[in-house]
Amino acid sequence: MKKLLALAVIAPLLISCSSSTKKGETYNEAWVKDTNGFDILMGQFANNIENLWGYKEVLIAGPKDYVKYTDQFQTRSHINFDDGAITVETIAGTEPTAHLRRAIIKTLLMGDDPTSVDLYSDVDDIKISKEPFLYGQVLDNTGQPIRWEGRATTFADYLLKTRLKSRSNGLSIIYSVTINLVPNHLDKRAHKYIGMVRQASRKYGVDESLILAIMQTESSFNPYAVSHADALGLMQVVQHSAGKDVFRSQGKSGTPSRNFLFDPASNIDTGTAYLAMLNNVYLSGIENPTSRRYAVITAYNGGAGSVLRVFSNDKIQAANMINRMSPGDVYQILTTRHPSAESRRYLYKVNSAQRSYRRR
């Protein structure tokens, strides 16, 4: 569903999300400073959009939504990786179809390097790639995939002639074109990362199906994934919590950079390393592997401490309580009694996705 976030809603959301220590429970002053700075940046960014597009038309990139503004924030491209749809829109007062045409072509031909694109500015930094990220995920009006600029241009012209729509936001007219992704777009994106997933699986001893399920739930295999908590990349790793924990376990100082976490291979490696830490260190006292897997999944979203506190404030006693339960009872408790509604839903989503990957 399209994420239309008004600025009044965004501000408290940013504060609450950024104060969470999701995917790790490390807390330090640097993390607070970085997060507060990110909140300010996001507030200013949302304000710029609201001033031009209107209160109900604020649209910002998220874990499963690529949103890029250009033309002094007058044109935007939105890929909804959940719904499988691309929407290109403009409020340009002069030659709106020219603005749409250019944005359609660049969106269809953009590469898969998130480090080259700033989603929080209107800088037109989208580079046309010989290996477009959306290749095979979009077919033109003749049923062909789009790799070259000539085919993308022809398709853009076709779309502007046959699918151009307009609506008013109270400030100006919004012109838009929507393109559907192919039905199996999720599988096509997942296929890009299978090799990296297998490598990380062997390296850390984490089941491939779990890694894929986490990626699907976190980002829908969107390498450009960002969040209001500043979680980054395919597995939505936060630099100053899970990222720092993994670096420390590997004998590295500091935290992974944004560019590091936007690199798909590095992101998958770091996210998988953190899953291994949860399984082998933080939650190792849970004896039944299925019960421990449920705990690991929930902890990847909300932290190991919050999982154990569902059962007892004492970590050892919590593990002992879990060990006396059946895996089904552990699942039931985590999906109904965890204090975070997001974490309760998360276990259900990841577990369901993992079952589907195991059947393949």
Swiss-Prot record:
<keyword id="KW-0732">Signal</keyword>
<comment type="function">
    <text>Murein-degrading enzyme. May play a role in recycling of muropeptides during cell elongation and/or cell division.</text>
</comment>
<dbReference type="InterPro" id="IPR000189">
    <property type="entry name" value="Transglyc_AS"/>
</dbReference>
<dbReference type="InterPro" id="IPR023664">
    <property type="entry name" value="Murein_transglycosylaseC"/>
</dbReference>
<dbReference type="InterPro" id="IPR023346">
    <property type="entry name" value="Lysozyme-like_dom_sf"/>
</dbReference>
<dbReference type="GO" id="GO:0009279">
    <property type="term" value="C:cell outer membrane"/>
</dbReference>
<feature type="signal peptide">
    <location>
        <begin position="1"/>
        <end position="16"/>
    </location>
</feature>
<dbReference type="Pfam" id="PF11873">
    <property type="entry name" value="Mltc_N"/>
</dbReference>
<dbReference type="GO" id="GO:0016798">
    <property type="term" value="F:hydrolase activity, acting on glycosyl bonds"/>
</dbReference>
<dbReference type="Pfam" id="PF01464">
    <property type="entry name" value="SLT"/>
</dbReference>
<feature type="lipid moiety-binding region" description="S-diacylglycerol cysteine">
    <location>
        <position position="17"/>
    </location>
</feature>
<keyword id="KW-0456">Lyase</keyword>
<keyword id="KW-0998">Cell outer membrane</keyword>
<keyword id="KW-0449">Lipoprotein</keyword>
<keyword id="KW-0472">Membrane</keyword>
<keyword id="KW-0564">Palmitate</keyword>
<dbReference type="GO" id="GO:0000270">
    <property type="term" value="P:peptidoglycan metabolic process"/>
</dbReference>
<dbReference type="InterPro" id="IPR024570">
    <property type="entry name" value="Murein_transglycosylaseC_N"/>
</dbReference>
<dbReference type="GO" id="GO:0008933">
    <property type="term" value="F:peptidoglycan lytic transglycosylase activity"/>
</dbReference>
<comment type="similarity">
    <text>Belongs to the transglycosylase Slt family.</text>
</comment>
<keyword id="KW-0961">Cell wall biogenesis/degradation</keyword>
<protein>
    <recommendedName>
        <fullName>Membrane-bound lytic murein transglycosylase C</fullName>
        <ecNumber>4.2.2.n1</ecNumber>
    </recommendedName>
</protein>
<feature type="lipid moiety-binding region" description="N-palmitoyl cysteine">
    <location>
        <position position="17"/>
    </location>
</feature>
<dbReference type="InterPro" id="IPR008258">
    <property type="entry name" value="Transglycosylase_SLT_dom_1"/>
</dbReference>
<dbReference type="GO" id="GO:0071555">
    <property type="term" value="P:cell wall organization"/>
</dbReference>
<dbReference type="GO" id="GO:0016998">
    <property type="term" value="P:cell wall macromolecule catabolic process"/>
</dbReference>
